[in-house]
């Protein structure tokens, strides 16, 4: 931690560290203006040294101005970020570009619940559960423990038998019935892990509704329009490569943005990945069109950086893309440029992934092969793609002419 807490010196040091992040000149100017604003705020209070109380007071002033409508949401976010970056610089003598949570989610206050919660999450990490699984467990188990606390419990031994069903009934106000299935799975895992949780296990719903809706895919017209726009310069090389990968392989967004440069075998025309959801290694063919766009992106458009990930932000700091949100944005933009799905229709990598699976099926690719490419640990999960294959479904239809009828026809 810095020992010289003179505000002017700390601000100059923080600005130098921010300058090393490679941000655009306009953003660097914004930080200088923000810190000038902080200095004026401090001078009006006869303060010339940094303190956590000064930052808290400045953040409170920002919040009051935001509530009063004096500043907008983006301005509020930037002012908060600049303040918290300065705090990190003072405490760590360095600045790391990261996301700051404006309103942290409430946590249980019971010491036993907090200990159980942290041990359970550590256990998931130890056994190599995916980041998505761990994040879901964090959220759902936290909600469960908060619900128990709201009902007067501070230990699992205090939980009455009606509280677990009441928790799931409570969730129906915000979760649909299909999502309850996921919640039940995470709570069941937590209770199996927690000492004293076995008593409550039978109370977790075991039979939950599972949706079997017909999944959305691109029509042939939409598919052709998307392929056409990908051949133009309207779409950046990075976005072309991501969309083509999804179209050709059906990979999940998280697996695409997690690809490393070393995963690509240019000699044998393959890509080797560890699937995020299953944790299993998988090798897919690198087709000529995907390979050409990938190589063009890496050689001509990708930022020059030591980061091992293939797909990076186009603006500094050059970090990997942030999974679903980044992919959704670039797919939506490409759909717009192709003139498709301009309304409320489903968009994003998931639609392209569904479309890839459906087209593989229509070309006679075995369901087991498709299941492996999609990363389904349960092979029956791929059966839903049969609902998008119109020709195969027609082949399953019963010819009513073969059924004897006692009346003139269907009524």
Predicted features, each with a name:
Residues 401-411:
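C-terminal secondary-structure termini that scaffold catalytic or DNA-interacting sites
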């Amino acid at each position: 931690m810095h020992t010289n807490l003179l505000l002017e010196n700390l601000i100059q040091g923080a600005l130098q560290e921010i300058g090393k992040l490679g941000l655009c000149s306009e953003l660097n100017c914004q930080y200088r203006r923000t810190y000038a604003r902080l200095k004026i705020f401090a001078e009006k209070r006869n303060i010339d040294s940094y303190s956590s109380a000064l930052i808290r007071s400045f953040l409170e002033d920002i919040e009051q101005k935001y509530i009063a409508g004096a500043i907008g949401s983006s301005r509020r976010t930037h002012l908060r970020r600049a303040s918290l970056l300065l705090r990190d610089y003072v405490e760590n003598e360095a600045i790391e570009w990261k996301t700051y949570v404006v309103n942290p989610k409430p946590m249980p206050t019971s010491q036993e619940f907090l200990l159980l919660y942290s041990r359970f999450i550590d256990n998931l990490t130890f056994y190599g559960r995916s980041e998505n699984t761990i994040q879901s467990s964090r959220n759902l188990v936290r909600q469960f423990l908060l619900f128990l606390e709201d009902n007067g419990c501070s230990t699992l031994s205090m939980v009455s038998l009606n509280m677990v069903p009441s928790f799931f009934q409570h969730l129906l106000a915000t979760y649909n019935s299909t999502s309850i299935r996921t919640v039940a799975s995470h709570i069941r895992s937590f209770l199996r892990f927690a000492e004293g949780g076995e008593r409550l296990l039978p109370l977790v719903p075991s039979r939950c509704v599972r949706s079997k809706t017909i999944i959305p895919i691109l029509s042939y017209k939409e598919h052709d329009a998307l392929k056409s726009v990908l051949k133009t310069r309207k779409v950046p090389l990075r976005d072309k490569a991501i969309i083509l990968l999804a179209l050709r392989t059906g990979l999940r967004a998280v697996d695409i943005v997690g690809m490393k440069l070393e995963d690509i075998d240019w000699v044998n025309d393959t890509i080797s990945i560890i699937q995020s959801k299953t944790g299993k290694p998988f090798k897919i063919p690198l087709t000529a069109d995907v390979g050409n766009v990938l190589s063009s992106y890496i050689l001509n458009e990708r930022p020059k950086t030591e980061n091992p990930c293939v797909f990076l932000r186009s603006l500094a700091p050059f970090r990997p893309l942030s999974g679903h949100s980044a992919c959704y944005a670039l797919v939506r933009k490409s759909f717009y440029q192709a003139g498709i799905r301009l309304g409320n229709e489903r968009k994003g990598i998931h639609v392209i992934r569904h479309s890839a699976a459906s087209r593989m099926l229509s070309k006679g690719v075995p369901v087991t092969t498709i299941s492996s490419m999609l990363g389904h640990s349960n092979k029956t999960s791929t059966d839903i793609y049969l609902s998008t294959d119109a020709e195969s479904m027609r082949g399953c239809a019963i010819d009513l002419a073969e059924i004897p009828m006692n009346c003139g026809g269907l009524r």
